[in-house]
Amino acid sequence: LLFAAAPAFGQDIFVMGEVHDNPAHHSVQAKRVADLRPAALVFEMLTPEQAKRISPGQLEDRDALANLLEWDESGWPDFGFYHSIMTAAPQARIYGAGVPREAARSVGDNGLAAVFGAGAEDYGLTQPLDEAEQAAREALQAKAHCDALPAAILPMMVDVQRLRDAALARKARTAMIETGGPVAVITGNGHARRDWGMPALLAMAAPDLDIHVLGQGEDDRPPEGSFDEIVYSPAPVRPDPCDAFR
């Protein structure tokens, strides 16, 4: 593992990015969480409803907890990756910031701000992105989906990404208020990026919070976007993700 900067633990909110299927990235997160001893853990991978099912005594039985959360139907990688992070801070209250699929699907019909609900303006959701950022985000969505998506749906894909960013920011803010912090946020690199992801929206809504952002690269490739710190780990052997679109 190569570290681009020394870890920092004086923050209110520590955002920890990942490539979801990279085991080394989750090992880094678990180590950082153990060192940080956060009062709260916020997961992109859990909806608020799922997080409410978890009580501290349930962390010991990984398989039972996975069944309780219906993890196998969630589409996320091996639950063990995230269970190791939960057990690294057994004292932490667990929050879910994931946007339910039904809500994400409704963005195209109902609009970004309406789906988010109260406080949308605080997180910039009532304003359009500037043209350059909108174009850059649409290009990233196209690339992430192997240029297989119709161009007409790319704006909605960007709106869903913004919705997920804002949901993460809102939940981190709530966790900070309810627990006093520190708060660790576990999410993908795309949501963790400081320039336009969850940290940017959180800083907009709660400028007094001190935020540190960790991005995780693979081999010598940094993640897209800007971060306070980048850690590099080997990329796992994986099939070509574009095979699914062929």
What are these regions (language model features)?
Residues 9-37:
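Zymogen propeptides
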Residues 12-14, 39, 181-187:
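Generic beta-sheet signal
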Residues 19-22, 46-50, 100-104, 189-193, ...:
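Solvent-exposed loop/turn segments at secondary-structure junctions
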Residues 28, 48-55:
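Membrane-embedded segments
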Residues 40-46, 212-216:
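Short internal beta-strands
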Residues 54-175:
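A substrate-binding/cap region within the structured catalytic cores of diverse enzymes
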Residues 167-176, 184, 191-246:
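C-terminal regions of proteins
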